[in-house]
Regions:
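A helix-centric hydrophobic-segment signal that preferentially recognizes long
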Residues: 2-192
Length: 192
């Protein structure tokens, strides 16, 4: 092989490596932006839930005044979520809030007069819808993170990820308490 041919092969190989790195880099940038956009949707739903909680708590407080521990935990979880600055802190605070709401639902079941309260029923319907939205947005976020993290670990993209500092993103897992949440029935009198 002549030196011209060797030089041509080296240049060709260098172009392939640079092109591959550039494509991988752009893919990572796009995936990270998608993760950020999806996290914003999760934040929107968490804020929606956070906004519903005071009305729900006030409705329950009027009837179940002796349950101060539960109300305190809910207030703490709202404050933590409001003060969280990173996705990881927000995930932790959201999981604590889910656990606190589960405790509230158990308390509420002990007060049948709440079931007939129209405002309580409306708030519970809104909360149920919001919880479903959070679950959907959490799933979409986790799908994006999983795709990104998988790309980040695959060859040759892992080289680009390492060179340019693309870090692994955390999944937004459901809280451990959610695996064993009690079933609660808030059926309204006379039907549903």
């Amino acid at each position: 092989m002549t030196w011209i041919r060797k030089a041509g092969l080296a240049v060709g190989l260098a172009l392939v490596v640079v092109g591959s790195t550039g494509c991988s880099y752009n893919t990572f940038v796009s995936q990270e932006e998608g993760i950020k956009a999806q996290w914003a949707q999760v934040e929107n739903q968490l804020q929606r839930r956070n906004d519903l909680i005071p009305n729900l708590v006030e409705t329950v407080k009027g009837i179940a005044q002796q349950e101060q521990d539960v109300f305190g935990r809910i207030a703490d979880s709202r404050a933590k979520l409001a003060g969280a600055t990173t996705p990881e802190q927000q995930m932790q605070a959201a999981n604590e809030q889910t656990a606190a709401l589960a405790r509230l639902l158990v308390v509420v079941e002990n007060y049948p007069q709440l079931r007939s309260n129209e405002q309580f029923a409306r708030l519970m319907d809104e909360l149920a819808g919001t919880e479903n939205r959070i679950a959907v947005e959490r799933m979409r976020y986790n799908e994006r993170v999983q795709a990104y993290n998988t790309s980040r670990r695959q060859f040759p993209s892992n080289i680009t990820a390492s060179l340019f500092g693309f870090k692994e993103h955390a999944l937004f897992d459901a809280p451990k308490e959610a695996e064993a949440l009690p079933r609660v029935n808030f059926g309204r009198p006379g039907g549903a």
